Amino acid sequence: MAKISKRINKIREGVDRNKLYDLSAAIGLVKERAVAKFDETIEIAMNLGVDPRHADQMVRGVVNLPNGTGRTVRVAVFARGDKAEEAKKAGADIVGAEELFEIVNGGKIDFDRCIATPDMMPLVGRLGKVLGPRGMMPNPKVGTVTTDVAAAVAASKGGAVEFRVEKAGIIHAGIGKVSFDNAKLEENIKAFADAVIKAKPSAAKGEYVKRVSLSSTMGVGVKVDPATVKVVA
């Protein structure tokens, strides 16, 4: 415990927890304090002025980060016939119909994103209790229920990030790796923030983006001045 506390205190050195840093400085601080022995993920948290308990204040969407996420994303596709072949050629890791349903329904989920053709949704819909809590249920609003499975697979593999506001009005997402150069991280963050702004529900009143912070997987959180991520709402 003493070693853990010492490590945390060391990481926190030089970070003013009450200060709003501009985006560039925040990225630098987070990267400098990412000392784990693996390539940590850089994560963004945005506190929004919405109450997701009300359906008309739900915030969700998908954004293609210009520089990808740095993650290897495993993609499952529910499809039959030609669409199944299309998915395989596009690089999907798992493709199937009833047999894939049985695997997932049994609790084996060896993938990060799930795509389905519209005709498969009556079957996939029965997996709501399995996929829903994991945020993996295919949804046409984020492009994961589609006839263009090749494009959906390519987007998923290439840096597409889904976001959905949580109960407390917070959105979390991984937007890159510590190994990314600062400019690429900044581009990804601004693209993500822009997508969240564009997803603002009409029912949201008052200040939309209240707080923004960055952190790494094992590192300290750094508060960011929303204006420097082009957040103007």
Swiss-Prot record:
Tell me one GO molecular function of this protein.
structural constituent of ribosome
Keyword Repressor, does the record have it? yes
Record GO cellular component, one term: cytosolic large ribosomal subunit
Gene Ontology BP terms: regulation of translation; translation
* Sorted UniProt keywords: Repressor, Ribonucleoprotein, Ribosomal protein, RNA-binding, rRNA-binding, Translation regulation, tRNA-binding
Task: Name the Pfam families on file.
Answer: Ribosomal_L1
Complexes and interactors: Part of the 50S ribosomal subunit.
For this protein, the record's PANTHER family field holds:
54S RIBOSOMAL PROTEIN L1, MITOCHONDRIAL, LARGE RIBOSOMAL SUBUNIT PROTEIN UL1M
The similarity annotation says: Belongs to the universal ribosomal protein uL1 family.
Described purpose of this protein according to its UniProt entry: Binds directly to 23S rRNA. The L1 stalk is quite mobile in the ribosome, and is involved in E site tRNA release. Protein L1 is also a translational repressor protein, it controls the translation of the L11 operon by binding to its mRNA.
UniProt protein name: Large ribosomal subunit protein uL1
Q: Which organism is it from?
A: Brucella anthropi (strain ATCC 49188 / DSM 6882 / CCUG 24695 / JCM 21032 / LMG 3331 / NBRC 15819 / NCTC 12168 / Alc 37) (Ochrobactrum anthropi)
- What gene is this protein a product of? rplA
